[in-house]
Amino acid sequence: VLVFNPHSFPCSSTVRVNGETCFAQNIPPLGYAVVAPKHSDGSIQVQQYSAENRYFRLHFDAHYNLMSIFDKEAQREVLDLSKGLGNQLEAYEDFPRDYDAWEITNYYKEKRYLVNDVTEAEAVHDGVRAGIRIRRKFLTSEIVQTIWLYEDIKKIDFETTIDWKQEHLLLKAAFP
């Protein structure tokens, strides 16, 4: 597959090829590279409440909130648990004075609801990435979130799809 870089600088990125995620590395500025699909080397380990690659080790609680993101290269914990869990989905009442959806009151944090109703969690594998897909319900809304780790890239992606049916409630993902 031919991958074009429209930027004026070299870049590396993930691309989808035949339904699988591949890594296109060092594509020249305003140039192209040929990318061949690569099968997973199995270096990403996903278990019920953890995921790990050569860069990060993630640990989740029973509601799939992050309890730990350990950076293996820096040899340090990324999250400060004294301030809360990571990727904790929170809903807040939202009754603005003038402009619905444009104005958040400064007292919105007074009514917080945790989105902890996990209906399903499963390991997912997609080419050069793997992770955990979590389905949550909140009242009549559904949130599907996949947390991805990559074989050759030092990043964590939080891919989130929200079917939000609530009125006067806002949703956020909190990280300490």
Features from the language model and the residues they span:
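Catalytic and substrate-binding regions of extracellular carbohydrate-active enzymes
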Residues: 1-173
